[in-house]
UniProtKB/Swiss-Prot annotation:
Protein name stated in the entry: Succinate dehydrogenase flavoprotein subunit
Location of this chain's protein in the cell: Cell inner membrane
Keywords tagged on the record: Cell inner membrane, Cell membrane, Electron transport, FAD, Flavoprotein, Membrane, Oxidoreductase, Transport, Tricarboxylic acid cycle
Molecular function via GO: electron transfer activity; flavin adenine dinucleotide binding; succinate dehydrogenase (quinone) activity; succinate dehydrogenase activity
Reactions this protein catalyses: a quinone + succinate = fumarate + a quinol
NCBIfam families, sorted: sdhA_forward, sdhA_frdA_Gneg
Gene3D superfamilies assigned: FAD/NAD(P)-binding domain, Fumarate reductase/succinate dehydrogenase flavoprotein-like, C-terminal domain, succinate dehydrogenase protein domain, Succinate dehydrogenase/fumarate reductase flavoprotein, catalytic domain
Cofactor(s) needed by this chain: FAD
Enzyme class: oxidoreductase
């Protein structure tokens, strides 16, 4: 079957913050760029980012990018790569002021400068008093960011393919990535997008869990595509559980609520975070706050309600005026999903899967990496990854709030700047043969031919329940081993699942089945990685190994898809402009 071909200098898969920032940089340089998105670009999941962009602008107090770097390294539980963290914190202010000049409508201080609010894990002067470092557009910062970047991409003539679903990467005989195949959801047409550079910006995969702040589109498509192309993934055991998802709904309640002065209560009305983090209290690292809430619930101090035990987030003491100006979106979400009015009563919250710290290992320039037999990093020609799908790794074992939007903008821009130079300089990659392109259609053909078998909805439900029960906030060896065995069975069931809808136009069931393949591979890589790391670090907290073990585990974990085995990869402790921050005990 010969596919129609569309040819571009670069194809960017995913139109969230990172994908649109990379595409913008490529288009501005005069290269041709295709931007593929399975939803309309401003519906990408970046739209749900609420609190802000953490960056050392120094608008509310004296600030310094090195203080921001210290907090990020500490937050990562010391497995964030310090060269990448340094680059992000140092170039952050420049990248954010560029957004301001593009027209991003930030909230303002009285003197007209960008408003910055306190967020968890932030400090002045290397661990001193609480800092206010998160630049915000009320509590709709992601929404403002997406609209700004979308307008700029239109202005710079990026070719946008809206509601196109990327199927798989296409590799040539040399192992270089030379584009991808994609399905037009509207017509059912399949096209080969041929490109000299392919940028994965597909976002997270929170839908492997039952309870998540992530939209239904966050199905790990980039992880699945990478693994099927033989690309390893790093630190997949590291999943952030946001302390405050609305109980029963999973909808995110921004950390900005606590930054503005909100606090958590147990059923006795006690501010319990004072016991777990005496200094930072409710603004400790997210992993610390999430574990504290779960301990309160396990020990019987959770609040009761129709959605099961939970904590309460109190905001009413801030007053109606502050809430309406600083947190208007939270008022709306709480009234809709929790049926409470935060102006009068607290919001019921529970830790909820939020962010994938792991992903495709990359350089600061977004170039995807694999590891050779000697354990050395090797660049994969033609493949880039930016945003949540990438593991640069600036977040290590625990991301700080507000650093995700900074990651999107800084590394989307960095990949674009690199491609600006390299596309012009590099020779032409060898074309993929017809059989290379056809290889990327195997999954689509399998689903199209499977008319009998199990209902994929039941399989997805089993997958999500397995992950929620065995790989959540607290983990334990026996449960995780059992969970991995269950996933092996679910994986076999998936091979014989059926597709009922045979239509070509707007066949959403077909897309959901293809997404399920990606959820499966992401969940499996997570389970293998979580069983491998025998310590507690950041978001990976094990009852059977409660301590951090720097002697054996101050490293990244790498899942190799060909052998389904694990290896270690060293953490970069060599920033270029200042001495490294050595590992120490992490307290808040």
């Amino acid at each position: 079957m010969k596919l129609p071909v569309r040819e571009f200098d670069a194809v960017v898969i995913g139109a969230g913050g990172a994908g649109m920032r990379a595409a913008l940089q490529i288009s501005q340089s005069g290269q041709t760029c295709a931007l593929l998105s399975k939803v309309f670009p401003t519906r990408s999941h970046t739209v749900s980012a609420q609190g802000g962009i953490t960056v050392a602008l120094g608008n509310t107090h004296e600030d310094n990018w090195e203080w921001h770097m210290y907090d990020t390294v500490k937050g990562s539980d010391y497995i964030g790569d310090q060269d990448a963290i340094e680059y992000m914190c140092k170039t952050g202010p420049e990248a954010i002021l560029e957004l301001e000049h593009m027209g991003l409508p930030f909230s303002r201080l009285d003197d007209g400068r960008i408003y910055q609010r306190p967020f968890g894990g932030q400090s002045k002067n290397f661990g001193g008093e609480q800092a206010a470092r998160t630049a915000a557009a009320a509590d709709r910062t992601g929404h403002a960011l997406l609209h700004t970047l979308y307008q700029q991409n239109l202005k710079n003539h990026t070719t946008i393919f809206s509601e196109w679903y990327a199927l798989d990467l296409v590799k040539n005989q040399d192992g270089a990535v030379v584009g991808c195949t994609a399905l037009c959801i509207e017509t059912g047409e399949v096209v080969y997008f041929k490109a000299r550079a392919t940028v994965l910006a597909t976002g997270g995969a929170g839908r492997i869990y039952q309870s998540t702040t992530n939209a239904h589109i966050n199905t790990g498509d980039g992880v699945g595509m990478a693994l099927r192309a033989g690309v390893p993934v790093q630190d997949m055991e590291m999943w952030q559980f946001h302390p405050t998802g609305i109980a029963g709904a999973g909808v995110l309640v921004t950390e900005g609520c606590r930054g503005e002065g909100g606090y958590l209560l147990n059923k006795h009305g006690e501010r319990f975070m004072e016991r777990y983090a005496p200094n930072a209290k409710d603004l400790a690292g997210r992993d610390v706050v999430a574990r504290s809430i779960m301990i309160e619930i396990r020990e019987g101090r959770g609040c009761d309600g129709p959605w099961g035990p939970h904590a309460k987030l109190k905001l009413d003491h801030l007053g109606k005026e502050v809430l309406e100006s600083r947190l208007p979106g939270i008022l709306e979400l709480s009234r809709t999903f929790a049926h409470v009015d935060p102006v009068k009563e607290p919001i019921p919250v529970i830790p909820t899967c939020h962010y994938m710290m792991g992903g495709i290992p990359t350089k600061v320039t977004g170039q995807a990496l694999t590891v050779n037999e000697q354990g050395e990093d090797v660049v994969i020609p033609g493949l880039f990854a930016v945003g949540e799908i990438a593991c640069v790794s600036v977040h290590g074992a625990n991301r700080l709030g507000g650093n995700s939007l900074l990651d999107l903008v800084v590394f989307g821009r960095a990949a674009g700047l690199h491609l600006q130079e390299s596309i012009a300089e590099q020779g032409v990659l060898r074309d993929a043969s017809e059989s290379d392109v056809e290889g990327s259609l195997e999954r689509l053909n399998r689903w199209n031919n499977n008319r009998n078998g199990e209902d994929p909805v039941a399989i997805r439900k089993a997958l999500q329940e397995c992950m929620q029960h065995n790989f959540s906030v607290f983990r334990e060896g026996d449960a995780m081993a059992k969970g991995l065995e269950q996933l092996k069975v679910i994986r076999e069931r998936l091979k014989n699942a059926r597709l009922d809808d045979t239509s070509s136009e707007f066949n959403t069931q077909r897309v959901e089945c293809l997404e399920l393949d990606n959820l499966m591979e992401t969940a499996y890589a997570t389970a293998v990685s979580a069983n491998f790391r025998t310590e507690s670090r950041g978001a990976h907290s094990r009852f059977d190994f409660p301590e951090r073990d720097d002697a054996n585990w101050l490293c990244h974990t790498l899942y190799q898809p060909q052998t389904e085995s694990m290896t270690r990869r060293s953490v970069n402790m060599e920033p270029k402009l200042r001495p490294a921050f050595p590992p120490k005990i992490r307290t808040y």
